[in-house]
Amino acid sequence: RSLDVARGKITVTAPDAAGLFYGLQSLGQLAERCGRRIPAVVIEDAPRFGYRGFMLDVSRHFRDKEFVKRQLDLLARYKFNRFHWHLTDGAGWRIEIKKYPVLTDIAAWRPYPDWEGWNFGGKRYCRRDDPAADGGYYTQDEIREVVEYARALHIEVIPEIEMPGHSEEVLAVFPELSCSGKPYLNSDFCIGNE
């Protein structure tokens, strides 16, 4: 992979589309630094690591789709190729599941905007129409849009769905699935309660 800047000519060579994309990222960084007059330079490089990843935990701290896309833009700029999207955990369920709308009606919303309030405040979840509701979730179409956006940037999205541990948000809305049959306890899914 190389970027060759000569008088009146810029050449980017790479074995594949991702390599060309990364070469253009390098060119953009040079242009940002040097303005319209990029000095003659030859850059030959390749990634040191095949897996160059970043994890965003939206379960604990929800961020909207546009924020996620801005993060992807930054990852692409620095040639990251994996985006680990932590979508569910005890702190919130962030994916629309049409068969189970109660997951996003309740488990996507907390009555506290900050982590400490949620973690130590007692009440864990609330309905989205609660005046104190803070949180959110991604519709299936928004998830598809983010995945396609990432693909265009040569970034693979790795969704993380915490199961069966770290699933307090699921057990809050489906307590019958826990071994105790009660929500808000440190309990995992009970294999016998399907």
Residue positions per predicted region:
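Second-shell loop/turn segments in exported
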Residues: 10-14, 57-61, 132-134
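Aromatic/hydrophobic pocket-lining residues that form π-stacking "cages" and hydrophobic walls in ligand
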Residues: 71, 146, 157
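Contiguous, structured surface segment used for ligand recognition
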Residues: 1-51
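Hydrophobic faces of well-ordered beta-strands that scaffold small-molecule active sites
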Residues: 52-56, 83-85, 157-161
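Aromatic/hydrophobic pocket-lining residues that form the small-molecule binding cavity
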Residues: 20, 68, 139, 143
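A conserved hydrophobic secondary-structure block that centers on an alpha-helix together
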Residues: 57-90
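Conserved hydrophobic/aromatic pocket- or pore-lining residues that grip, position, or stack substrates
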Residues: 16, 75, 157
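Aromatic- and acidic-residue-enriched carbohydrate-binding clefts of CAZyme catalytic domains
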Residues: 91-152, 167-194
